[in-house]
Every structure is written in structure tokens, then in C-alpha cells.
Amino acid sequence: MFEVVIGLEVHTQLNTKTKIFCSCSTSFGDEANTHVCPTCLALPGALPVLNKEAVKKAISFGTAINAKINKKSVFNRKNYFYPDLPKAYQISQFEIPIVEGGELIIDVNGEKKRIGITRAHLEEDAGKNIHESDHSLVDLNRAGTPLLEIVSEPDLRSSDEAVAYLKKLHSILRFLNISDANMQEGSFRCDANVSIRPKGDSKLYTRVEIKNLNSFKFIQKAIDYEVERQSAAWEDGKYDEEVYQETRLFDTTNLVTRSMRGKEDSAEYRYFPDPDLLPVLVDKAMYDEAIKIPELADEKVVRYQKEFGVKEDDALNLVSTIEMSRYFEDLVNSKISPKLCVTWLLVELNGRLKNGVTIETSPINSAKMIEFLKRIEDGTISGKAGKEVLDYLMEHPSEDVDAVIEKLGLKQVSDDSAIVAIIDQILAANADKVAEYKAGKDKMFGFFVGQVMKEGKGAFNPAKVNELLKSRLA
């Protein structure tokens, strides 16, 4: 039996407006090579100037993971040649990163586990190569976008743990508002270092790096395949022959990893301090500002339970994304019953979001949902009618809630005289059952409620029906 050893390197783009060493925009998806300047293009004489906001965002992250913040850190040149790297070196941090140490607590199947973080350092992103059938193009819009590289300890022991760690990290970055962490756009990318060893052995064996994984699903499948490949090689006596230090890519069509190149050691990058950049000195004012971080998901889970009486499972779902959390807080801050908010948000509205639509892109925004929930809470419509109204609003979100209720004829009748007339009619037609009820057969009350609601075609306010029925049977 083997034990799996996994360490993860995550590159997340920081959501600064400009690049890390120049004033070019970091906007995504624009025409190729329109956000470039002499610094991005590595023209002779162009000098880098550090973006202060990137430093502050790195400090905020370090604070969130209980890390050591180095008040003095240094930028280095990481030397390698690639077409999307105009300088033939990347400006990164090596010996003294801005963030050292730290931890994340993950939860897998109800069991909590501490995952150590080695470091988080600032660096610049490379450009993007676009390969056609007979030629390649280079887009340097991305070159120089600020990256925070977050390196975990090799503490992960399964693909499930790896995904749990990445989801926790993703949540922290989003709740801190330091990165949009959009995996589809490449602003949250993961390299997985995977090795195996016999159970009980503490030695670290040959690690294989799987590069540029950009979905939780593929990260899990890539790790599982690589573990299976290495295990089979060991059992066949071919471990030394087939498993060596290399970089592999994940084939998302065939769900296998494929060899890309030999994995470099740090010495091969010939790191040395960048002579164009002074050491980064974090003064007290910058530090004090950067460590003021917002409430994170774990803290919100605790608060939702204490303040609003939300169940733990529901609280976890409410913080599954920052957009869901904001939506919920908009609802409860409008003084609507938290229980009502949870039910209609997690079950009813969320259940209607399909085909890639999320709470962020929901046709019904929080303001419209507040109007709608107030009509349920004040008894204007019943819960059953509310589902019809919500269905209609999903298709016609711009329409007024009250106008929709009137149009669909779903407004509850709360007029005492109209309800009493029906109650008296039902009681007169069921004199024998009235006698049974008065003789102590309490369950007959439910029969009367059902008959009245049926006669009222669902338009009667159930609470009012109960109140008036009790008085007429007294």
C-alpha cells in the first residue's frame, strides 16, 4: 500500500488596476498587445516601478493565513527563455518572500486537517502563446500582471484533500477581494507536485509536477491518474525507469498526464537579486492598513449560526461564494425573518438557477427578492403562491412584485367576513364532524382547515383561517 504526498503551487492574479511594474492596464479579454509599454516589452532602458497595491494585497493574504509578514523582502531575476517572456527572465521573489509560513484548516468528510503553507511571494505573470496550425502568436497583454504564488507544504494525502485546500484558498482570496480567482480566465492556476511512498515511510520520493490545472474537476482527475500511474510503475518494478523529476501536462480529453519536459531545479534558473529594484520595505502605515481584513467565510459561518440561528450546513452553503454571502446579508439586513431568507434563497431561488446561471447572474437581484419575501412575510401571498410568483419573476424580472401578484390572481384573502362566510358554510354542511371535534377529536380541525382552503381556492390566508375557525368552533 502506498501513501500519496501532494504539494500545491497556486498562481493567483491580484486584482490591481495596473500591472506590477508599470502602469499598463490588467484588463482581461481586450485586443492582443494593446496593454503594453516599453517595460512590458523589455525595451532597453525601461525600468520597473513596483505597484504598492500588489504589496498590500499580499500582506492581507498573509494576515488571513496567520503567516509571518517580512517587513523587508527582495525581488530576484528568475532566468529562463520562453517566447512569452520578453526579458528572458521573470521578476520574482526567491530568498526573502513577502509572506512566510502560515496555514489553512481544511475539512474533508467532517475531519479537519491543518495544511502548512511554506510561503507566498510576488512575481510578474508571463504573456500568452497562441498556437495555430503553422505558426504561433504571442499576446503580451498579460505580461507583468501581478501574481501571488502560494506554495503549500507537502501535507496533502489525497486528491480530495487537494481540492478541499484549493477551494478554501479560493474562498479566502475572493472574500479578501484581492483576486477574482477566475479559473476560466486563468487568474487562479494550480501546479500539483505528486509523489508516492510505501505506507510508514517518511522519505520523500521523486515528485512529478502537473502544470497549469485550471478546474477543480481536472485537478482531482489529474492527481488520481498520476497516483495510479506511479503506483503501477512501482508494482511492475519500473518505478526508477518511468517515474522521474519532470513536468507533465494533463490531457483533458483522454484524462491522462503526458510528459512535457524535465523539471528544472532552482539552480538552473540562476536566481540573483534584481539590480533595478530596491528591497521592499513595508512601513508601519502600510502594514497597519493592509492587515485590516474583512470577515472571511469561516467567521461568517459562526456568526450566521449565532446571530441568525442558521443551521451549520445552511451557513456553509451561504458562504459557498462571496456573491451568495452578500445576497443573503442583503436579505437579512432588510429585517426579513432569517429562516424565510434561508429557505427561499438556498432552496427556491438557488434551485431555479440552471444552465450556468449563478446567484451573481441571477435575473432576480437581492432588491427584487426583498420585495418578494416581504409579501410572503406580511401574508399578501402564501408560500405555495410564492413559488408561482417566483417562477414568473425568473422570466420577467423587471416587473413589479405587487403587479405580478395581482396579474396572477394570487393575493391572499384576509377579509374576515369572506372567510367566516365559507367557514360557516363548511361547518353547517358537516354538523356530525363538528360534534366529533367538540367531543375531543382534535384531528377534525385539520379537516375543516382543508375544506375552507379548498373552497377558497388557495386564496385564503392560512393563519387567518386558523384563527377564525378556532373562534367559530369555540
Swiss-Prot record:
Top-level enzyme category: ligase
EC number: 6.3.5.-
One GO process term, biological-process aspect: glutaminyl-tRNAGln biosynthesis via transamidation
Pfam families named among the record's database cross-references: GatB_N (PF02934), GatB_Yqey (PF02637)
Gene Ontology MF: a single term: ATP binding
Keyword tags: ATP-binding, Ligase, Nucleotide-binding, Protein biosynthesis
Keyword Protein biosynthesis in annotation: yes
UniProt-listed SUPFAM superfamilies: GatB/YqeY motif, Glutamine synthetase/guanido kinase
Gene3D superfamilies per UniProt: 1.10.10.410, GatB domain, N-terminal subdomain
InterPro entries in UniProt: Asn/Gln-tRNA_amidoTrfase_suB/E, Asn/Gln-tRNA_Trfase_suB/E_cat, Asn/Gln_amidotransferase, Asn/Gln_tRNA_amidoTrase-B-like, GatB, GatB_C_1, GatB_Yqey_C_2, Gln-tRNA_amidoTrfase_suB_CS
NCBIfam families per record: gatB (TIGR00133), PRK05477.1-2 (NF004012), PRK05477.1-4 (NF004014)
Subunit composition and interactions: Heterotrimer of A, B and C subunits.
Family classification: Belongs to the GatB/GatE family. GatB subfamily.
Name assigned to this protein: Aspartyl/glutamyl-tRNA(Asn/Gln) amidotransferase subunit B
Organism encoding this protein: Campylobacter curvus (strain 525.92)
Lineage of source species: Bacteria, Pseudomonadati, Campylobacterota, Epsilonproteobacteria, Campylobacterales
Gene: gatB
